[in-house]
């Protein structure tokens, strides 16, 4: 007998059906050939007895078998439902008394194939697992779509077209690193060539982004290496000679402050 789980087995015996046919009168005999059958059941006990005693004439064999099973206790197989010529439900149950049984398992026969009916627990587990996997995939997709930028103070959700443009632009940028060696104190005066249409100097656009990390490092090192232990970064004036603005090389119009 196969060690494969019974709820994953599809069993059939075309040779048996070709020899005996398949109908309600012999469907239990056909089922007894399958790995789902319990050979310690009351059905097997009665089959052994019927080999040595004659079934009364003019009595349906299935009804006679059913009447004998009612008189016994233990595991038994009965036909729970039938729809000839291609569908039957076989039920495995434990009989405690002539009127009391505990249902153990159902099997169904479709054509020549026999299957074990799945339990409700297995069905719900499978459906829940499928749902959880779908939700997990959706969450992963949402995480890929969302991008957090500290400068924007939140998440952004670029469109598919924007993603394609970013991807194409990243593929065209060479894998080289350029270092900005421009002196932080350097200031380019505004001329007619670098004035935009709105009247603002192009060198002042994005000024905060042009301040290099080197300028901040120099400012911090001046405080750390100072011989005066009472000097702190917040003690340095913001404007004027020796101020933070001067150290960073930022030109500020004090009239706008």
From Swiss-Prot:
Q: Which keywords, in A-to-Z order, does the entry hold?
A: Activator, Nucleus, Transcription, Transcription regulation
Task: Provide the protein's localization.
Answer: Nucleus
- Which GO terms are recorded in the biological process aspect for this UniProt protein? positive regulation of transcription elongation by RNA polymerase II; positive regulation of transcription initiation by RNA polymerase II; RNA polymerase II preinitiation complex assembly
Question: Which Gene Ontology CC terms are recorded?
Answer: core mediator complex; mediator complex
- List the InterPro entries hit by this protein, alphabetically: Mediator_Med6, Mediator_Med6_fun, Mediator_Med6_sf
Predominantly, its location class is nucleus
The record ties this protein, via Gene3D superfamilies, to: Mediator complex, subunit Med6 (3.10.450.580)
GO molecular function terms noted in the UniProt entry: transcription coactivator activity
Q: Where are the transmembrane segments?
A: none
- Assembly mode: Component of the Mediator complex.
Q: Please give the family membership noted in the entry.
A: Belongs to the Mediator complex subunit 6 family.
PANTHER family the record matches: MED-6-RELATED (PTHR13104)
| Function description | Component of the Mediator complex, a coactivator involved in the regulated transcription of nearly all RNA polymerase II-dependent genes. Mediator functions as a bridge to convey information from gene-specific regulatory proteins to the basal RNA polymerase II transcription machinery. Mediator is recruited to promoters by direct interactions with regulatory proteins and serves as a scaffold for the assembly of a functional preinitiation complex with RNA polymerase II and the general transcription factors.
Protein name (Swiss-Prot/TrEMBL): Mediator of RNA polymerase II transcription subunit 6
Q: Which organism is it from?
A: Debaryomyces hansenii (strain ATCC 36239 / CBS 767 / BCRC 21394 / JCM 1990 / NBRC 0083 / IGC 2968)
């Amino acid at each position: 007998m196969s060690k494969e789980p019974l709820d994953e087995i599809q069993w059939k015996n075309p040779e048996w059906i070709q020899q005996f046919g398949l109908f309600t009168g012999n469907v239990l005999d056909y089922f007894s050939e399958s790995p789902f059958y319990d050979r310690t059941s009351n059905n097997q006990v009665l089959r052994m007895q019927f080999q040595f005693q004659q079934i009364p004439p003019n009595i349906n064999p299935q009804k006679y078998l059913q009447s004998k099973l009612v008189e016994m206790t233990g595991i038994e197989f009965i036909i729970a439902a039938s729809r000839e010529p291609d569908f039957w439900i076989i039920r495995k149950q434990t009989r405690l008394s002539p009127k009391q049984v505990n249902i153990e398992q159902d099997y169904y026969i479709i054509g020549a194939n026999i299957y074990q009916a799945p339990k409700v627990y297995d069905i719900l587990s499978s459906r829940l697992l499928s749902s959880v996997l779908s939700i997990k995939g959706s969450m992963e997709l949402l995480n890929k779509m969302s991008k957090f930028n500290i400068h924007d103070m939140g998440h952004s959700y670029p469109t598919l077209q924007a993603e394609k443009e970013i991807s194409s632009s990243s593929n065209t940028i060479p894998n080289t690193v350029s270092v900005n060696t421009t002196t932080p104190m350097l200031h380019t005066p505004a001329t007619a060539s670098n004035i935009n249409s709105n009247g603002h100097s192009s060198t002042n656009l994005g000024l905060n982004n042009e301040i290099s990390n080197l300028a901040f490092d120099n400012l911090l090192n001046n405080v750390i290496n100072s011989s005066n232990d009472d000097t702190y970064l917040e003690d340095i004036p913001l404007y004027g000679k020796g101020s933070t603005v001067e150290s960073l090389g930022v030109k500020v119009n004090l009239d706008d402050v």
